[in-house]
């Protein structure tokens, strides 16, 4: 049976469950999915004590790896609540992370291919590559002020 964490409520309930099972302490705040995370599995915010998680990690690696990332973020959370060193460099963090079998580093997510639009100047042949489309009636070549055409 594969666990499906589709909503913020499901995610928060899962984090609360992991906190009780692996730490013996309650998680009293909220957990959120954050699609903007690229190179990290999760983040802990000391100001309001909420956790953000990367949904790509959950989708790509499954619940086992994701649970280890949840443990990692809960190490930050519980140590901060207890007033101990909660940063990666702190001894208390390293010891607790090893004790609960959390991940020290997030596995790499396969990069999403970015599509580019290619344009070239009719006069001088200068080639431009842009992520966003360019209005060809409004913009001209930056070198010779010639007309741009879309090339493939």
From Swiss-Prot:
Domain SprT-like: 13-148
Single annotated GO MF: zinc ion binding
One of the record's GO cellular component terms: cytoplasm
Named cofactor requirement(s): Zn(2+)
Main localization category: cytoplasm
Entry-linked InterPro entries: SprT-like_domain, Uncharacterised_SprT-like
Name of one Pfam family that matches: SprT-like
Residues binding Zn(2+): 72, 76
Statement: the UniProt record of this protein carries the keyword Phosphoprotein: no
Keyword Nucleotide-binding: no
Cofactor binding mode and count: Binds 1 zinc ion.
Active site: 73
Cell compartments where the protein resides: Cytoplasm
Keywords linked to the UniProt accession: Cytoplasm, Metal-binding, Zinc
GO biological process, alphabetically ordered: response to stress
Alphabetized HAMAP family for the sequence: SprT_like (MF_00745)
Family: Belongs to the SprT family.
Name recorded for this polypeptide: Protein SprT-like
Species the sequence originates in: Streptococcus agalactiae serotype III (strain NEM316)
